[in-house]
């Protein structure tokens, strides 16, 4: 249990979702609809902690580590995006979660789209922030040969070990993309994104080989094919690409989901939710307001 405070009361839990994978997540007390937060490639559940804390008084946030990340299992590669979807579907079914607000950034957003399409009876609303969905590019066949991208090569060369958490924090905070993150977001990520090693040091909780495998499998994503099958109310935050990494969420995403509304954030880039907590919280509250009205009308 974390330190006292309404938004800080969370516990680390884990659930076996397949023979090879156990998913870990921070869970807050139930004070309203369940919100399930899905992070981007290479990050961890702690990235969403400030957002969760700001809506914990009216919801039940669940911030989880995708397979290969944080405290979740790290099975061998490949890390196909379809497996990430299968994990979340299995979690919602195993725990019998319904009336869920699903929130995703980057690969987490793509995963959220596909989970909502597969489980419309359980997912009541979506908030997608810079979801990696490419309607104009057909998915590649599984195992299709392609030379490693510069992104993958850089990822595999990334430094992943330090003598202490403090050293890791200083090293990472001085470098992009972490140098532009909100201070609370960075603190939450450092808490779950860096873990102790047996020799007394620390290392990234998402090994570079896992992150590289997720990047390699991007072209196999079929999330774009599921956009039209999303039936729940959807709020989309899209960056203009004017800051840091370019936007990965084209306008076609909002245009293809029948129930979507889109907010374009000027002067922002792909790491929007990690730099601007308030933008995401505004969308979360809008979704929770809508869910509350829908629940009242049903009753």
Show which residues each predicted segment covers:
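Catalytic histidine-centered segment of alpha/beta-hydrolase-like enzymes
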Residues: 268-277, 281
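Active-site loop/oxyanion-hole signature of alpha/beta-hydrolase fold enzymes
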Residues: 50-53, 62, 66-107, 282
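Helix-rich cap/lid subdomain of alpha/beta-hydrolase
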Residues: 138-201
């Amino acid at each position: 249990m974390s330190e006292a405070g309404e938004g800080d009361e969370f516990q680390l839990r884990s659930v076996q979702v397949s023979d090879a994978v156990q998913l870990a997540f921070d869970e807050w007390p139930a004070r309203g609809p369940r919100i399930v937060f899905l992070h981007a490639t290479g990050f961890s559940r702690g990235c969403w902690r400030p957002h969760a804390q700001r809506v914990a008084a009216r919801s039940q946030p669940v911030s989880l580590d995708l397979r290969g990340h944080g405290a979740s299992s790290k099975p061998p590669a490949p890390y196909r995006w379809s497996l990430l979807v299968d994990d979340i579907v299995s979690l919602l079914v195993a725990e019998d979660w319904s009336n869920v607000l699903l929130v995703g950034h980057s690969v987490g957003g793509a995963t959220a789209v596909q989970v909502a399409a597969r489980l419309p009876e359980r997912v009541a609303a979506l908030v997608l922030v810079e979801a990696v969905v490419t309607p104009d590019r057909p998915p590649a066949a599984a195992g299709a040969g392609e030379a490693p991208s510069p992104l993958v090569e850089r990822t595999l060369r990334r430094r992943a070990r330090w003598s202490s958490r403090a050293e890791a924090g200083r090293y990472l905070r001085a470098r992009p993309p972490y140098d532009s993150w909100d201070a609370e977001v960075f603190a939450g990520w450092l808490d779950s994104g860096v873990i102790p090693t047996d020799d007394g040091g620390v290392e990234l909780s998402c090994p570079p080989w896992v992150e590289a495998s997720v990047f390699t499998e991007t072209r196999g994503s079929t999330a774009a094919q599921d956009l039209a099958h999303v039936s729940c109310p959807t709020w989309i935050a899209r960056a203009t690409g004017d800051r840091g990494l370019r936007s990965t969420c084209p306008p076609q995403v909002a245009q293809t989901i029948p129930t979507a509304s889109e907010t374009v954030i000027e002067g922002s880039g792909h790491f929007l939710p990690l730099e601007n907590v308030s933008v995401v919280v505004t969308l979360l509250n809008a979704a929770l307001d809508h869910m509350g009205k829908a629940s009242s009308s049903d009753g």
